[in-house]
């Protein structure tokens, strides 16, 4: 599986070619996503949740558990500033965009799905799509897209802040700075006044 991170649309800025067992593949893909996506402050009701990691868990486990391993098509996870796109070869059970309300889950690799459920990398069949919808709406305010065909495609829309890097052009320049002595003096003055 290839993981690609883009800042410049003309070339990828980071790449991880993952050729290992399913468990290690899962870990590397999650880490790649965490490296390129910010953990935004997201509330589910009154509880702060890590929507980024929950989305990654669902799309990575779905890709690994439902991929057609007899195909030579390389699975991909591409992260750019607008979306995450995951593609994998597929034994199609239908064609076109999947509708959450009409979706009927179909196990493509039941043995892999069962192992993933047993070790906690996936939940019951079909819950991944519901969870991805829920956490994508919390993370980006939009709906994900699932397209079934010979290539299964998952598209997770992103807010600009989800991929912004700290530093560089985002840091103001020429900001007046105080020496530590000046800062200490200012703090003491404020304490005396307070």
Where are these regions (language model features)?
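C-terminal regulatory or interaction extensions
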Residues: 1-194
